């Protein structure tokens, strides 16, 4: 099995103004991540890819383009989770056939699913696809808060490799790593890379890595090497950048920063605001000049 540790960009998707997928732009984003950001892999089909506003066929098209462009240069994780289990299975089978290294699935959301229902969801995707699985835990968006015992139940399935941990509960993170040292944890909050790395995470998956991947790796590797003061200085700069991005509109701003690098990052998918305002464009230029030049 391919090594899935390290720095993974949560892949942005370029859309045309009419909302269709901009294949040329998407390929440029992928190449930028591989050639410039030097990431270890891509997490395809997640929140950053505006996934939950897309049709099944559009999701498949993005999986296809990403695999065709990246080939075997880096590791690829396909996020196939959906509140529709049949869609999750269909996407999982498709990504597996394409040769994705691993699947991931967000916990089923909106309805208040019981834990046995959540476990059934993961076990079904795994059984139907035969691929490995990374649980995607993002409780502030899904409302699903799992404890250490529940993760332990999921980990009884040998195909569950670990969790993408997008939560602020670092006590739970530490407890999980101690209780299940052979299961991997990917940090999901870019702004908390240093504390996550100090607690032993195996990698990180982040949206801002599309433009700030080099610093993300520096923070991760310096922290692992015990050089905390150096790592903290880079985390400070990173968080200044992230603060500016968040204040200006997360996905729009990252796309505008990519455009300033010559990447056709396109528009966002409605009902998100699809196009940056002049004020947002000016702020993106300011962020690039301060942090990415």
From Swiss-Prot:
Domain of life: Bacteria
Binding locations of aceneuramate: 47-48, 166, 188, 190-191, 207
UniProt pathway: Amino-sugar metabolism; N-acetylneuraminate degradation; D-fructose 6-phosphate from N-acetylneuraminate: step 1/5
Name of the protein in its database record: N-acetylneuraminate lyase
Sequence similarity: Belongs to the DapA family. NanA subfamily.
Assembly, per entry: Homotetramer.
Its job: Catalyzes the reversible aldol cleavage of N-acetylneuraminic acid (sialic acid; Neu5Ac) to form pyruvate and N-acetylmannosamine (ManNAc) via a Schiff base intermediate.
A GO term, aspect molecular function: N-acetylneuraminate lyase activity
EC number of the protein: 4.1.3.3
Keywords assigned by UniProt, alphabetized: Carbohydrate metabolism, Cytoplasm, Lyase, Schiff base
Membrane-crossing residue ranges in chain numbering: none
One Pfam family recorded for the sequence: DHDPS
Gene: nanA
Keyword rRNA-binding: no
GO biological process, one term: carbohydrate metabolic process
Subcellular location(s) per record: Cytoplasm
């Amino acid at each position: 099995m391919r090594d899935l540790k390290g720095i993974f960009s949560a892949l942005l998707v370029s859309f045309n103004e009419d909302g269709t997928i901009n294949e040329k732009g998407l390929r440029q984003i992928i190449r930028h991540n591989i050639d410039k950001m030097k990431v270890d892999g891509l997490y395809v089909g997640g929140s950053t890819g505006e996934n939950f506003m897309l049709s099944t066929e559009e999701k498949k098209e993005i999986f296809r383009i990403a695999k065709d462009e990246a080939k075997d240069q880096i590791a690829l994780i396909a996020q196939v989770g959906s509140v529709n289990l049949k869609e999750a299975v269909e996407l999982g089978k498709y990504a597996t056939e394409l040769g994705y290294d691993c699947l991931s699935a967000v916990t089923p959301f909106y309805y208040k699913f019981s834990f046995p229902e959540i476990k059934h969801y993961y076990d079904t995707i795994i059984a139907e696809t035969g691929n490995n699985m990374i649980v995607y835990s993002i409780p502030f968006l899904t409302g699903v808060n799992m404890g250490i015992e529940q993760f332990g139940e999921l980990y009884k399935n040998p195909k569950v490799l670990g969790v993408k941990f997008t939560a602020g509960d670092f006590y739970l993170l530490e407890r999980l790593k101690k209780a299940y040292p052979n299961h991997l944890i990917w940090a999901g909050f870019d702004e908390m890379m240093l504390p996550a790395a100090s607690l032993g995470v195996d990698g990180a998956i982040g949206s801002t890595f599309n433009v700030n991947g080099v610093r993300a790796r520096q923070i991760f590797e310096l922290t692992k090497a015990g050089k905390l003061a150096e790592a903290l200085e880079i985390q400070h700069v990173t968080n200044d950048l992230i603060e500016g991005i968040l204040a200006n509109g997360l996905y729009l701003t990252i796309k505008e920063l990519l455009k300033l690098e010559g990447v056709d990052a396109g528009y966002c998918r409605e009902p998100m605001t699809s196009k940056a305002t002049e004020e947002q464009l000016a702020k993106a230029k300011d962020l690039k000049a301060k942090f990415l030049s």
